[in-house]
């Protein structure tokens, strides 16, 4: 997480808002451990050449394929996306994370996520052209449920995922319709799901930026504070925090399989080209 304190003027009142790119929003590995000592008698010298801090050299090498981890890229991106914040409506920025959004069709998408005093901002950012292309704004006082747990799929699903995620749900009176659930391009689904970035923990400089636990802790704190200061009708009980399976209703999952295997939701090099 990056801690920021900055803001820019603008206006808006929708609990959830989708902004397209260009829309006006207002003015303006070293060694370590025992491997670092001198080799003992009869010990092959080459054993001391492997730094113990590198548990997965292949994964560490792959981090270079992601544009976001190139020197100065994440710093520039964070600096630029501050302009999407509406100080009157959103308040100050509390933190920024680099996470992976998993949509209702199990597609992975690289996202910059901001938590402000009053809003959750989900930014689609192109780390190649260094442009913010889209922003989804969710009012924190509209969040009714935050769930954390392992992913769950229908028994006969052909494309499942392992691991843990966090799901943020809002507008409990408007659960996804049948059409929204089965439309892979729907933007009206009233929840979002995040997992850690696939390269989380590889780059020590950005490790805290990708931590899901830190994001969850600050999100819960920010939602409770926003609901206490600006409660909505029907939210008297506060946000519901659950530890439970996160259901993704995909069966064949061919589209998400292709998307996730090829990492199409990430800005990264692909052979001699990058997209």
From Swiss-Prot:
GO cellular component terms, A-Z: calyx of Held; cytoplasm; presynaptic active zone; synaptic vesicle; synaptic vesicle membrane
Modified residues (Phosphothreonine): 43
Keyword Cytoplasm: no
Superkingdom of origin organism: Eukaryota
Composition bias, Gly residues: 25-40
Positions of the UniProt region annotated as Important for homomultimer formation and localization to presynaptic regions: 61-100
Membrane topology field: Peripheral membrane protein
GO biological process: regulation of synaptic transmission, glutamatergic
Region annotation (Disordered) ranges: 21-42
Domain hSac2, first and last residues per copy: 68-240
UniProt PTM comment: Phosphorylated. Phosphorylation promotes association with synaptic vesicle membranes.
Keyword Nucleotidyltransferase: no
Post-translational modification Phosphoserine, affected residues: 10, 14
Pfam families reported in the protein's UniProt record: hSac2 (PF12456)
Location in or out of the cell: Cytoplasmic vesicle, Secretory vesicle, Synaptic vesicle membrane; Presynaptic active zone
Alphabetic keyword roster: Cell projection, Cytoplasmic vesicle, Membrane, Phosphoprotein, Synapse
PANTHER family: TUMOR PROTEIN P63-REGULATED GENE 1-LIKE PROTEIN
Function: Presynaptic protein involved in the synaptic transmission tuning. Regulates synaptic release probability by decreasing the calcium sensitivity of release.
Similarity comment: family membership: Belongs to the TPRG1 family.
Protein name: Tumor protein p63-regulated gene 1-like protein
Species lineage: Eukaryota, Metazoa, Chordata, Craniata, Vertebrata
